[in-house]
Swiss-Prot record:
Gene that specifies this protein: AQY1
Residue ranges, compositional bias (Polar residues): 296-305
Organism of origin: Saccharomyces cerevisiae (strain ATCC 204508 / S288c)
Entry comment, domain topic: Aquaporins contain two tandem repeats each containing three membrane-spanning domains and a pore-forming loop with the signature motif Asn-Pro-Ala (NPA).
Keyword list, A-Z: Cell membrane, Endoplasmic reticulum, Membrane, Repeat, Transmembrane, Transmembrane helix, Transport
GO molecular function, one term: water channel activity
Chain positions covered by the region annotation Disordered: 1-34, 286-305
Protein's UniProt name: Aquaporin-1
Gene Ontology CC terms, in alphabetical order: endoplasmic reticulum; endoplasmic reticulum membrane; plasma membrane
Length: 305
């Protein structure tokens, strides 16, 4: 037998079941095919395309549902008696529409592209090194295009005037509107960083607090700014309504400043290494409780004797 034949035989035997049962053939190990959605080192064209599709579909689904609900609330005669959208029923309806829409959209597409659905949120993720700068740009383009598509679709499917565009109300100035948008966006982005980026046992439920934070932002800001906190949402509605007020820039500058503010707070916590101290405090508390429980058990045993 030649040396080549013996080598082939050796290779064949190395792939047999080590237990020797029925000489079962064990196929060679296959390369890992699943990729980390937020791994910066993977910037292949295919990965970017998948992320772009996921962000487009998620953002479109989120904003189309929210736009239509917002249009219904603003056309309802019973809800528009109060000036500038300050009727409680109107506020709650709009807030629920946006909060629940982003919640189920994130749950659907978080496993595809991360489910940012918001350029401001994408910027926070990029600053936190959860996504690469290239991926951030890809997400931005998909989200902005999806926002305009959702606005056009909602406008075409619903009769009457487009009433889901952002505008200042209740005498709110541009400066106040800028800071309201900034802090509203910061709360939303910080919620994302603390519940989705931080490694916790409750990461799978991140969509719930994110939806709640957007709900709260709409209750707080709608009467004053119309609640942008998402440049794709503001631009898509403005294009559909063909209404670009001279202060439209606050829905971009304010939200981007808010995303930077949220990242700054998150980064400060990382510098302080809060997880180490929180873990140590929990361990000390657990140890103290165990000691007290042991002392109680000893006292009970002595009393019985």
């Amino acid at each position: 037998m030649s040396s080549n034949d013996s080598n082939d035989t050796d290779k064949q035997h190395t792939r047999l079941d080590p237990t020797g049962v029925d000489d079962a053939y064990i196929p060679p190990e296959q390369p890992e095919t699943k990729h980390h959605r937020f791994k910066i080192s993977r910037d292949t064209l295919r990965d970017h395309f998948i992320a772009a599709v996921g962000e487009f579909c998620g953002t479109f689904m989120f904003l189309w549902c929210a736009y239509v609900i917002c249009n219904v609330a603003n056309h309802d005669v019973a809800l528009v008696a109060a000036p500038d959208g300050s009727h409680p029923g109107q506020l709650i309806m709009i807030a629920i529409g946006f909060g629940f829409s982003v919640m189920f959209s994130i749950w659907c597409f978080a496993g595809v592209s991360g489910g940012a659905l918001n350029p401001a949120m994408s910027l926070s993720l990029c600053l936190a090194r959860a996504v690469s700068p290239t991926r951030c740009v890809v997400m931005w383009v998909s989200q902005i295009v999806a926002g305009m598509a959702a606005g056009g679709a909602a406008s075409a499917m619903t009769p009457g005037e487009v009433l889901f565009a952002n505008s200042l109300g209740l005498g709110c100035s541009r400066t106040r509107g800028l800071f309201l948008e900034m802090f509203g966006t910061a709360i939303l982005c910080l919620t994302v960083l603390m519940t989705a980026v931080e490694k916790r046992e409750t990461n799978f439920m991140a969509a719930l607090p994110i939806g709640i934070s957007l709900f709260i932002a709409h209750v707080a800001l709608t009467a004053y700014t119309g609640t942008g906190v998402n440049p794709a949402r503001s631009l898509g509605a403005a294009v559909a309504a063909r209404y670009f007020p001279h202060y439209h820039w606050i829905y971009w500058i304010g939200t981007l400043l808010g995303s930077i503010l949220a990242w700054s707070v998150w980064q400060l916590l990382q510098i302080l290494d809060y997880t180490t101290y929180v873990t140590a405090e929990k361990a000390a508390s657990t140890k103290e409780k165990a000691q007290k429980k042991g002392e109680t058990s000893s006292s009970s045993a002595v009393a019985e004797v």
